């Protein structure tokens, strides 16, 4: 049967001697960060075996997949399997002829960590009679000598000894047992977290304390009636002690108090020192900053040579516009009938059902030139607009998207005869109510949508122009004097690209982009009018990641140099020595340092400044290249240090939280006082509570044991 010894500790949840003294060095942690992504667990390869002893493994077909039938019986019956939770003995586990797979050390380590995570709740699982014996992944593994590889050709040069292998059935059975236990722990884990957050059980720095009996009284007073902690108080006490070294229970039988937490390594990494933030925090922040820089691809966004559009493009993001407020010469994807055209003209179009619709065109009417638009979704919202006139009430009226085709440019239209074909692709009916202001009628939220895809229009004639208009339509003729609006573009137009790889530059679709040439090449107006998939917007999105990385890493203030601003300073120092036109100004290093720092701070505040011509420093592509490459170098050469200001600020902030926490716990001990030695008690040793009747007594002992 084997040798075993047990240790039994007897605790009294409401008794004397228990300790509640959270500290930064004993902060509670129980979250197992498992790395179970497919890319980490696989591929470990598969085991291969030679067909015969006399056959050379280099011969064609000399290796075959190893199966469970190839494992000796002595290896199948794993004598080390003493847990029995998921037994590997052939009498208990289905012993079918299955292919074997190699298990990586990464998988073994993570499944073992998952087993450890379950044991935080061992006493509760025993109470439920779930997973009554601790699982042990290693008991399901068999170690064999074999060739290892994903293919036979790879395996023939990779013979290994003592390779851990497992069958799919055993692997599935093991994971199912872990999942069943986790399912049983769902509400239990929530209730434990409620108990740990109902009052402060952690402190960012230093130490705080409160009488444990006061803490227990507060929990008894405030926990929900259906909390599992009420039903299983003793098991909860043990589980909390394992998570938080500041919660300690006295062993009644021995009169000793011991720290039962199992997270000493993690807790120490989470605790700050006397002069520095926690090691875990510094590591995580540096990792985040480096991930952002990697995602931005500094080499791509600073390239001086063309980059293919699909490489430079980012996942498309919607952009909002008010078409009526965009300058036609900036928004090159718009067209407009000149305002000087005097007489409006009416046209009649149909929709896909053959219904006839009437609409008016006049001077000032605007359309989207679909020939300059990549596949796009248009959504127009007139919500909040009025469009009311003396003889025109928008309530009940219809607005629609109309697609035109004509060989005559839109800005030259003066009559319906100049239009080739037109169709209503979608329309909605408006609902409007009188505004609080006189003579206005506010339109409710609308969603007039159209998905434009060039293939729908059968563009075979290169001389044909295609346009999209949004305006009022009606089944009867619309009197021009009643409805005088040129269109309904005075609304919120949301444009969402339907393709990810297409890029435009100022309204023109391009096949490649020179990123460095984008720097300082847009006016604020042209940037505002650029399409959602414009190269400038792609550049700004990538540059924003650089700015965010700098913000995470850099705590320098305005006019202060830092590792991330000095790349600009170095470029400025050289550029002022270069021969050029005009009067050269030589700035000393102190001035250059401030100029570089201010440029970096402006970039962090608004990354789009690198694109617009208004930026005094970073609109120069040389300064931008220096910054993009310098930030990458700065982060790659950084250790686990923190900025001076960051360290001081975090420590002083942590001390303020510590003081607040202790003040709160002092109030807990005041309003839920622990019984004094001379206070009368009930028969079970607990103090009578005038506040409420106890629904579930915490009094009693728990015997906690484990084998070794």
From Swiss-Prot:
Name the UniProt key words of this record, in alphabetical order.
Answer: Apoptosis, Capsid protein, Glycoprotein, Host cell membrane, Host endoplasmic reticulum, Host membrane, Host mitochondrion, Lipoprotein, Membrane, Myristate, Outer capsid protein, Viral penetration into host cytoplasm, Viral penetration via permeabilization of host membrane, Virion, Virus entry into host cell
Is-annotated flag, keyword Cell inner membrane?
A: no
Care to name a GO molecular-function term for this sequence? host cell surface binding
What the entry lists under Pfam families is as follows: Reovirus_M2
Q: Where is the lipid attached (N-myristoyl glycine)?
A: 2
For whether the record's keyword set contains Lipoprotein, the answer is yes
Sites of glycosylation? 12, 81, 110, 458, 482, 528, 659
Site residues, Cleavage:
42-43
Query: According to its UniProt record, how is this protein modified after translation?
Result: Cleaved during the endosomal proteolytic disassembly of the outer capsid. Mu-1 is proteolytically cleaved into mu-1N and mu-1C during the maturation step to generate the ISVP. Cleavage of mu-1 to mu-1C is dependent on myristoylation and binding to sigma-3 protein. Mu-1C is further cleaved into delta (59 kDa), and phi (13 kDa) segments during entry into the host cell cytoplasm.
Changing residue 42 to A: reported impact? Answer: Complete loss of mu-1N cleavage and host membrane penetration
Q: Where is this region: Disordered?
A: 674-708
Q: State whether it acts alone or in a complex, and with which partners, per the record.
A: Heterohexamer of three sigma-3 and three Mu-1 proteins.
Function comment:
Major outer capsid protein involved in host cell membrane penetration. In the endocytic compartment, outer-capsid protein sigma-3 is removed by cathepsin proteases, which exposes the viral membrane-penetration protein mu-1. Both myristoylated peptides mu-1N and phi are released during infectious subvirion particles (ISVP) formation in the endosome. They associate with host membranes and mu-1N induces permeabilization and delivery of transcriptionally active viral particles into the host cell cytoplasm. Seems to induce apoptosis in the host cell. The viral outer shell polypeptides, of which mu-1 is one, impose structural constraints that prevent elongation of nascent transcripts by the RNA-dependent RNA polymerase lambda-3.
Q: What is this protein called?
A: Outer capsid protein mu-1
């Amino acid at each position: 049967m084997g040798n075993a010894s047990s240790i039994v500790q007897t605790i009294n949840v409401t008794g004397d001697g228990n300790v509640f003294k959270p500290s930064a060095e004993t902060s509670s942690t129980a979250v197992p960060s498992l790395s179970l992504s497919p890319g980490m667990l696989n591929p470990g390869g598969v085991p291969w075996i030679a067909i015969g002893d006399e056959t050379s493994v280099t011969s064609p077909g000399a290796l075959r997949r190893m199966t469970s039938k190839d494992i000796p019986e002595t290896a199948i019956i794993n004598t080390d399997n003493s847990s029995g939770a998921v037994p590997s003995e052939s009498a208990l586990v289905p012993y079918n002829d299955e292919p074997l797979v190699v298990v990586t050390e990464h998988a073994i380590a993570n499944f073992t960590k998952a087993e450890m995570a379950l044991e935080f709740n061992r006493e509760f699982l025993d109470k439920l009679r779930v997973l009554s014996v601790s699982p042990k992944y290693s008991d399901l593994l068999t170690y064999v000598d074999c060739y290892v590889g994903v293919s036979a050709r790879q395996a023939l040069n990779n013979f290994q000894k003592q390779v851990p292998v497992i069958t799919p059935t055993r692997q599935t059975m093991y994971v199912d047992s872990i999942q069943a236990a986790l399912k049983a722990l769902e509400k239990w884990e929530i209730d434990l977290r409620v108990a740990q957050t109902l009052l402060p059980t952690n402190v960012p720095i230093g130490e705080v304390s409160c009488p444990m009996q006061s803490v227990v009284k507060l929990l008894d007073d405030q926990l929900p009636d259906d909390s599992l902690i009420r039903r299983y108080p003793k098991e909860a006490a043990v589980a909390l002690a394992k998570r938080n070294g500041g919660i300690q229970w006295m062993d009644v039988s021995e009169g000793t108090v011991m720290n039962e937490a199992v997270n000493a390594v993690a807790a120490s990494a989470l605790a700050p020192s006397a002069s520095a933030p926690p090691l875990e925090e510094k590591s995580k922040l540096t990792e985040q900053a480096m991930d952002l820089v990697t995602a931005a691809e500094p080499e791509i966004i600073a390239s001086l040579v063309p980059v293919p559009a699909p490489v430079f493009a980012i996942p498309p993001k919607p952009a909002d516009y008010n078409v009526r407020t965009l300058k036609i010469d900036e928004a090159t994807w718009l067209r407009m009938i000149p305002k000087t055209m005097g007489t409006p003209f009416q046209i009649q179009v149909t929709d896909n059902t053959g219904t006839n619709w009437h609409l008016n065109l006049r001077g000032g009417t605007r359309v989207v030139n679909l020939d300059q638009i990549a596949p796009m979704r248009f959504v127009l919202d007139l919500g909040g607009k009025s469009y009311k006139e003396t003889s025109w009430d928008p309530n009940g009226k219809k607005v629609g998207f109309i697609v035109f085709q004509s060989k005559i440019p839109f800005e030259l239209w003066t009559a319906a005869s100049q239009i080739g074909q037109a169709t209503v692709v979608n329309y909605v009916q408006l609902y409007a109510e009188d505004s609080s202001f006189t003579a206005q009628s506010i339109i409710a939220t609308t969603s007039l949508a159209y998905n434009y895809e060039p293939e729908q229009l059968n563009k075979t004639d290169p001389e044909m122009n295609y346009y999209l208009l949004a305006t009022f339509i009606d089944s009867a003729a619309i009197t021009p004097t009643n409805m005088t609006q040129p269109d309904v573009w005075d609304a919120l137009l949301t444009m969402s690209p339907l393709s990810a790889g297409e890029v435009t530059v100022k309204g023109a679709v391009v096949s490649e982009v020179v990123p460095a040439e984008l720097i300082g090449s847009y006016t604020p107006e042209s940037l505002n009018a650029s399409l959602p998939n414009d190269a400038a917007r792609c550049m700004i999105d990538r540059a924003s990641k650089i700015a965010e990385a700098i913000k995470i890493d850099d705590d320098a203030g305005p006019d202060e140099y830092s590792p991330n601003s000095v790349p600009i300073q170095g470029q400025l120092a050289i550029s002022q020595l270069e021969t050029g036109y005009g009067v050269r100004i030589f700035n000393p290093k102190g001035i250059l340092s401030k100029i570089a720092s201010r440029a970096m701070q402006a970039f962090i505040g608004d990354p789009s400044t690198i694109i617009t011509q208004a930026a005094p420093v970073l609109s120069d592509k040389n300064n931008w290249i220096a910054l993009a490459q310098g930030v990458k170098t700065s982060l790659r050469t950084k250790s686990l240090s923190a900025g001076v200001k960051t360290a001081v600020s975090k420590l002083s902030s942590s001390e303020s939280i510590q003081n607040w926490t202790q003040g709160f716990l002092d109030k807990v001990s005041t309003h839920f006082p622990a019984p004094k030695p001379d206070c009368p008690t009930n028969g079970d040793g607990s103090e009578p509570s005038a506040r409420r009747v106890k629904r579930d007594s915490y009094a009693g002992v728990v015997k906690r044991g484990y084998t070794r």
